[in-house]
């Protein structure tokens, strides 16, 4: 594999349209206050010592800024940024090719690091700790191990499934950072910053209307903002996005007052109709969705906002969830 795996992933950022809206510097990053405070210390210390920063593990629900933070760390350290993804690394040789092509102090970002297979993880162990690769050459009695030195680097791993990372790999990250859902006020700032970047007028009520339906997630906030902007340009050509206009556009997009879309509501209604604990496999079958997708994208916010509860016997609708479905006339 030369750098094909590396370049293949870099050509597919999580959302091309978000690239221009991403903050480039740590001072521009909105939210995750405690994480940012600590990162400033770690970045500045490593930069002043002219040493690679310790390896970083970013974990939390999708869309909270893990990839953006990885870019920012490299930018602040003034080093090259290289990226790939766990599913793209099928052989130990794929990872070895990337590591041997790094420059000193580079940042290597591995998205979905929980999807690395164990053989590749073992290659990472010596690379992370000793900046070397142990390569087995030959087979059987003639097999021998070659030790290849690689440049000192910083590995940044990102995952939405922290529990799926093996303990040996997890323990080799000196800086584990958990990203939390955003508050409405923080999402308002994210939306206003994006509006300024793409020269779209939006007032406080419009930004707050979108933010309140974004499930605590910047990626969703930016996606909804772009769609509301589309409606504005289609219907008025110019003007300001206010609360009423944003509400109307979001209604047309099928986003309700709590930020739930049709799939969220289908999930909640199914759990309600089950009249008791229901297993994730049963839910996935009923919704025709992958179990992993439900656990990664649908459930985290529903659990965070106490609409559903996980129990040893399955998922249960909470009183809050029941009252919401009832008051919104979904049941």
UniProtKB/Swiss-Prot annotation:
Residues 183-254 are annotated as: Small ATPAse domain (RuvB-S). The keyword DNA damage applies. One of its GO terms (cellular component) is Holliday junction resolvase complex. Its main location: cytoplasm. Its EC number is 3.6.4.-. GO terms for biological process: DNA recombination; DNA repair. Residues 257-331 are annotated as: Head domain (RuvB-H). Keywords: ATP-binding, Cytoplasm, DNA damage, DNA recombination, DNA repair, DNA-binding, Hydrolase, Nucleotide-binding. ATP binds at residues 21-22, 63, 66-68, 129-131, 172, 182, 219. It is found in: Cytoplasm. It catalyses: ATP + H2O = ADP + phosphate + H(+). Residues 1-182 are annotated as: Large ATPase domain (RuvB-L). SUPFAM superfamilies: P-loop containing nucleoside triphosphate hydrolases (SSF52540), Winged helix' DNA-binding domain (SSF46785). Mg(2+) binds at residue 67. The keyword ATP-binding applies. Pfam families: AAA_lid_4 (PF17864), RuvB_C (PF05491), RuvB_N (PF05496). DNA binds at residues 310, 315. Belongs to the RuvB family. NCBIfam families: PRK00080.1, ruvB. PANTHER family: HOLLIDAY JUNCTION BRANCH MIGRATION COMPLEX SUBUNIT RUVB (PTHR42848:SF1), PTHR42848. Homohexamer. Forms an RuvA(8)-RuvB(12)-Holliday junction (HJ) complex. HJ DNA is sandwiched between 2 RuvA tetramers; dsDNA enters through RuvA and exits via RuvB. An RuvB hexamer assembles on each DNA strand where it exits the tetramer. Each RuvB hexamer is contacted by two RuvA subunits (via domain III) on 2 adjacent RuvB subunits; this complex drives branch migration. In the full resolvosome a probable DNA-RuvA(4)-RuvB(12)-RuvC(2) complex forms which resolves the HJ. Has 3 domains, the large (RuvB-L) and small ATPase (RuvB-S) domains and the C-terminal head (RuvB-H) domain. The head domain binds DNA, while the ATPase domains jointly bind ATP, ADP or are empty depending on the state of the subunit in the translocation cycle. During a single DNA translocation step the structure of each domain remains the same, but their relative positions change. The RuvA-RuvB-RuvC complex processes Holliday junction (HJ) DNA during genetic recombination and DNA repair, while the RuvA-RuvB complex plays an important role in the rescue of blocked DNA replication forks via replication fork reversal (RFR). RuvA specifically binds to HJ cruciform DNA, conferring on it an open structure. The RuvB hexamer acts as an ATP-dependent pump, pulling dsDNA into and through the RuvAB complex. RuvB forms 2 homohexamers on either side of HJ DNA bound by 1 or 2 RuvA tetramers; 4 subunits per hexamer contact DNA at a time. This is Holliday junction branch migration complex subunit RuvB. It comes from Anaplasma marginale (strain Florida).
């Amino acid at each position: 594999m030369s750098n094909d795996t590396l370049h293949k992933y870099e050509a597919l950022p999580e959302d091309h349209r978000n690239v221009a809206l991403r903050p480039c510097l740590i001072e521009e990053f909105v939210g995750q206050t405690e994480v940012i405070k600590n990162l400033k210390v770690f970045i500045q210390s490593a930069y002043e010592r002219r040493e690679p920063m310790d390896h970083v593990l970013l974990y939390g629900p999708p869309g909270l800024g893990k990839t953006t933070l990885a870019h920012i760390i490299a930018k602040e350290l003034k080093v090259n940024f290289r990226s790939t993804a766990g599913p793209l690394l099928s052989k130990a040789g794929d990872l070895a090719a990337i590591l041997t092509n790094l420059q000193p102090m580079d940042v290597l970002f591995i998205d979905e690091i929980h999807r690395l297979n164990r053989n590749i993880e073992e290659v990472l162990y010596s690379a992370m700790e000793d900046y070397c690769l142990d390569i087995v050459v030959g087979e059987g009695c003639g097999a021998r191990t070659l030790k290849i030195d690689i440049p000192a680097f910083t590995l940044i791993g990102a995952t939405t499934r922290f529990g799926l990372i093996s303990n040996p790999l997890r323990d080799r990250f000196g800086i584990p950072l958990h990203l939390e859902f955003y508050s409405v006020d923080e999402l308002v700032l994210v939306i206003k910053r994006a509006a300024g970047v793409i020269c779209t007028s939006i007032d406080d009520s419009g930004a707050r209307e979108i933010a309140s339906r974004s499930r605590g997630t910047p990626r969703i906030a930016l996606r909804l903002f772009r769609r509301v902007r589309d409606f504005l340009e289609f219907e008025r050509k110019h003007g300001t996005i206010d609360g009423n206009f944003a509400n109307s556009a979001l209604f047309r997009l099928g986003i309700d007052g709590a930020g739930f879309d049709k799939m969220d509501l289908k999930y909640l209604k199914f759990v309600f109709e089950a009249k008791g604990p229901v297993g994730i496999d049963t839910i996935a079958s009923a919704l025709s969705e992958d179990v992993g997708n439900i656990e990664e994208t649908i459930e985290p916010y529903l659990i965070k906002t106490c609409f559903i509860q996980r129990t040893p016997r399955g998922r249960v609708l909470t009183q809050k969830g029941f009252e919401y479905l009832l008051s919104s006339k979904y049941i």
